[in-house]
């Protein structure tokens, strides 16, 4: 057994450290115990790996040996009603293929036109709050129809999705205790509220005789074999999981891209000048810097894990774990600061030399790769490009730091990042 396993006091200290600052906690344990160690916390045994060989081994397990899906579900189910997962027919992998993503581009542009009109000619906003609303508009406009991106429906849907937000289990782990204590009554109420709004959008489209071959229509076709009332419910629940999956990282990644540009005059000038591919590289670099994802594999059958020094037999029930924020900024020289030159397209540049590629991640590796990667990057690039074309910005902040308590997903900001804007026309 690697070092770190302990008794009740050790488990209590681990839980406290993880809640206060997960990244700093894992980094301290790594310095004290080495590249492979055990943490017992919150009823789980975590086998933590940070060596090149150990992290590569984590990503190499087959799903039936050590499950990524079950490990993630184990965290999300604490926040989301269990009946939301039953009967799903349309998954992110189904909807985010290369050809499918191209269908979203027009919807993203339409959603941005609505958002720019809502912002008006001048004002100010907090970047992460605005990005959250914008992320909802971009996502819902893409798979719930352009109607959902309108202010009429968006102002009803946003608070419902925010209440149901499964990423809260990662961003603010302590709040999950309240969800458990209340039996998820507020989350279930939000789920039913979204079901009613989606049914209303579809009914309005049908009563107006409108035929539109978008993803909302595709979702409804996939449930053609069930009664209309139940069909509305099942379509809405597919849509909820798809939207929640994209929003867990999209809006924070969008916010950090804009924040990093506002803090770097040189890169901002190059983006405004239209340097080819630069905005995409800024998005990937912003995600790399802000990643707080904890990668988990729940062991289902005994597996052998090689960390480069020795091989461990890992029993079922153990979570094999690494945390991206520990390695993303330390795996090679220069990765501790923002520089879009670290990327060529969606891959790290040849100048970034790593012991293994898995030590740095934005959207995951192998079966961990986020299916919404192309959609998310397209959404970020379109949104930031349209905002910069329309407005001049003045940052009312001089620094931005990731939220220290976050475990999972792309970080939210520790402090508000307020900007003033004025139309360029």
Which residues are covered by each model-predicted region?
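Conserved cytochrome P450 K-helix E-x-x-R motif and the immediately C-terminal K′/meander segment
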Residues: 15-28, 275-312
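Cytochrome P450 catalytic-core helices
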Residues: 238, 247-272, 371-391
């Amino acid at each position: 057994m690697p070092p770190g396993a302990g008794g009740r006091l050790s488990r209590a200290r681990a839980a406290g450290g993880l809640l206060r600052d997960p990244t700093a906690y894992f980094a301290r344990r790594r310095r004290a115990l080495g590249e492979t160690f055990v943490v017992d916390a919150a009823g789980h045994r975590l086998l933590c790996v940070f060596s090149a060989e150990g992290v590569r081994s984590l990503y190499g397990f087959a799903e039936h040996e050590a499950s990524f899906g079950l490990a993630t579900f184990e965290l999300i189910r604490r926040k989301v009603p269990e009946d939301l997962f039953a009967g799903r027919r349309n998954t992110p992998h189904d909807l985010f293929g290369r050809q499918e993503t191209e269908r979203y581009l027009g919807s993203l542009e339409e959603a941005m036109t609505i958002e720019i009109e809502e912002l008006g000619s001048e004002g100010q906003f907090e970047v992460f709050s605005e990005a959250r609303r914008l992320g909802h508009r971009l996502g819902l406009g893409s798979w719930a129809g352009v109607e959902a991106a309108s202010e009429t429906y968006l102002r009803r849907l946003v608070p419902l999705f925010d209440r149901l937000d499964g990423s809260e289990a990662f961003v603010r782990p302590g709040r999950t205790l309240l969800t458990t204590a209340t039996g998820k009554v507020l989350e279930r109420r939000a789920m039913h509220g979204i079901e009613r709004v989606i049914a209303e959008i579809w009914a309005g489209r049908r009563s107006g005789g409108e035929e539109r071959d978008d993803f909302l229509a595709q979702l409804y076709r996939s449930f053609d074999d069930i009664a209309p009332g139940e069909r509305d419910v099942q379509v809405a629940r597919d849509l909820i999981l798809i939207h929640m999956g994209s929003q867990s990282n999209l809006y924070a990644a969008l916010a950090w891209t804009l924040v990093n540009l506002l803090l770097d005059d040189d890169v901002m000038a190059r983006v405004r000048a239209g340097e080819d591919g630069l905005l995409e590289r800024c998005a990937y670099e912003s995600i790399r810097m802000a990643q707080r994802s904890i990668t988990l594999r729940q062991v289902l059958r005994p597996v052998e894990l090689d960390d480069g020094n020795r091989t461990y037999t890992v029993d079922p029930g153990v979570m094999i774990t690494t945390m991206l924020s520990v390695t993303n900024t330390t795996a090679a020289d220069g990765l501790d600061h923002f520089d879009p030159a670290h990327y060529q397209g969606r891959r790290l540049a040849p100048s970034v030399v790593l012991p293994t590629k898995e030590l740095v991640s934005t959207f995951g590796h192998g079966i961990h790769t986020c299916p919404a990667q192309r959609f998310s990057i397209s959404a970020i690039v379109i949104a930031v490009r349209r905002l910069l074309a329309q407005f001049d910005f003045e940052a009312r902040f001089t620094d931005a730091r990731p939220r220290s308590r976050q475990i999972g997903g792309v970080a939210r900001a520790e402090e508000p990042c307020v900007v003033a804007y004025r139309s360029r026309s």
